[in-house]
């Protein structure tokens, strides 16, 4: 059974299709829910590992339906999320003569999705992109909402564009080959939604015996977790597509999280691990400022630990360097570092007035 979640964004509206084996049903989903046709050449952008597992399924299904699709295989890893790597997509688009009616299919995790979306936003001033996320993090976050981009040496996602996909196809079966560490990273984003938007999701996660392994989760409950997480992202994005206000709430845990990723050269901590530490830090800031209760912060910490995610800053990280990186964050407003702080389970708020000394004290304490 395929669950459809509409993303209502006016002329940029689309659907999220969640269900087993949907990767092989891609042509039927495209025909039913998008205006896209196989008339123009297309690219499938992926990385070697994902292509080895699922490339044949997706390319075969599209080819059988009449699509002219060529793979574009990029190196795996956040450190390759750069303009130089995106140029490889442009080169493939040029060699395959992609035109304005062409489509880019993003088959991979958040890195592939972000780069493919950015390439689609900028090639010929914008062509269609279809997201086929293969990591939990991409399924519940990166593939939804139209944020695309690449990193700059001075900060994460500083170069980018908003470009909504025409369709998001989520096949939970592909998570069978996802490394456990990457599954846990995705669970950080799921917990985020529970903390700042969906109290029912938070309570559902609290009742589950384990959050660190897909195999330990009953399939029906896991689909419910997926659906509620996607719906949370849709609820926010549909109210604020371009992050003029409310959508910034989705950056909970990301202010410090992005700085942690950057200072570790995108190798020492993955995105979810960095966000988990960022949520712990934001929770402590919220308690210190009187916005949140210590009991709620403890409940958040319990979920993060249940997902076997880190809660402290690695001892060899330079906290003063972290503080400097925060000033380059794209969320800085009038030189004030913007934080998303929880006010209750399922609720959060934007805060631009967090004292710098409190941030410093909190980071040093989390490293102790």
Curated annotation (Swiss-Prot):
Localization in the cell: Cytoplasm
Cofactor: NAD(+); Co(2+); Zn(2+)
Cofactor note text: Binds 1 divalent metal cation per subunit. Can use either Co(2+) or Zn(2+).
Gene3D superfamilies assigned: 3.40.50.1970, Dehydroquinate synthase-like - alpha domain
Residues given in the record as Zn(2+) binding sites: 189, 254, 271
Keywords for this protein: Amino-acid biosynthesis, Aromatic amino acid biosynthesis, Cobalt, Cytoplasm, Lyase, Metal-binding, NAD, Nucleotide-binding, Zinc
Enzyme superclass (EC): lyase
One of the protein's GO biological processes: aromatic amino acid family biosynthetic process
One Pfam family recorded for the sequence: DHQS_C
Enzyme Commission designation: 4.2.3.4
InterPro entries listed in its UniProt record: Dehydroquinate_synthase, DHQ_synth_AroB, DHQ_synth_fam, DHQS/DOIS_N, DHQS_C
GO cellular component: cytoplasm
Binding site for NAD(+): 110-114, 134-135, 147, 156
Pathway(s) where this gene product acts: Metabolic intermediate biosynthesis; chorismate biosynthesis; chorismate from D-erythrose 4-phosphate and phosphoenolpyruvate: step 2/7
GO function terms (MF aspect): 3-dehydroquinate synthase activity; metal ion binding; nucleotide binding
Catalyzed chemical reaction(s): 7-phospho-2-dehydro-3-deoxy-D-arabino-heptonate = 3-dehydroquinate + phosphate
Family the UniProt entry places it in: Belongs to the sugar phosphate cyclases superfamily. Dehydroquinate synthase family.
Record PANTHER family: 3-DEHYDROQUINATE SYNTHASE, 3-DEHYDROQUINATE SYNTHASE, CHLOROPLASTIC
Role this protein plays: Catalyzes the conversion of 3-deoxy-D-arabino-heptulosonate 7-phosphate (DAHP) to dehydroquinate (DHQ).
NCBIfam families given in the database record: aroB
Name used for this protein in its record: 3-dehydroquinate synthase
């Amino acid at each position: 059974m395929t669950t459809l979640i509409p993303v209502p964004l006016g002329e940029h509206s689309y659907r999220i299709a969640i269900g087993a084996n949907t990767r092989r049903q891609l042509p039927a989903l495209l025909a039913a829910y998008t205006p896209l046709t196989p008339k123009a050449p297309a690219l499938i952008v992926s990385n070697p590992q994902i292509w080895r597992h699922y490339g044949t399924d997706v390319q075969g299904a599209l080819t059988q339906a009449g699509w002219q699709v060529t793979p574009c295989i990029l190196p795996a890893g956040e450190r390759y999320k750069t303009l130089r790597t995106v140029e490889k997509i442009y080169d493939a688009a040029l060699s395959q003569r992609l035109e304005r009616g062409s489509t880019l299919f993003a088959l991979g995790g958040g890195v592939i999705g972000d780069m493919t979306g950015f390439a689609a936003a900028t090639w010929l001033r914008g062509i269609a992109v279809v997201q086929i996320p293969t990591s939990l993090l991409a399924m519940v976050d990166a593939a939804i909402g139209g944020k695309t981009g690449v990193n700059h040496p001075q900060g994460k996602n500083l170069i980018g564009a908003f470009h909504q996909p025409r369709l998001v196809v989520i096949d939970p079966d592909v998570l069978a080959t996802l490394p456990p560490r990457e599954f846990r990273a995705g669970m950080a984003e799921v917990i985020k939604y529970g903390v700042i938007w969906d109290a029912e999701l938070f309570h559902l996660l609290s009742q589950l015996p384990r959050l660190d392994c897909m195999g330990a989760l009953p399939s029906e409950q896991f689909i419910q977790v997926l659906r509620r997480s996607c719906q949370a992202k849709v609820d926010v994005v549909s109210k604020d597509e371009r992050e003029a206000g409310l959508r910034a709430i989705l950056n909970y845990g990301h202010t410090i999280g992005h700085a942690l990723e950057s200072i570790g050269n995108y190798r020492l901590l993955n995105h979810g691990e960095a966000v988990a530490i960022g949520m712990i830090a934001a929770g402590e800031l919220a308690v210190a400022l009187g916005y949140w209760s210590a009991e709620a912060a403890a409940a958040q910490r319990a979920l993060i630990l249940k997902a076997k995610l880190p809660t402290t800053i690695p001892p060899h990280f330079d906290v003063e360097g972290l503080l400097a990186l925060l000033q380059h964050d794209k969320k800085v407003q009038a030189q004030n570092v913007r934080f998303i702080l929880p006010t209750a389970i399922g609720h959060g708020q934007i805060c631009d007035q967090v004292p710098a000394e409190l941030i410093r004290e909190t980071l040093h304490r989390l490293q102790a």
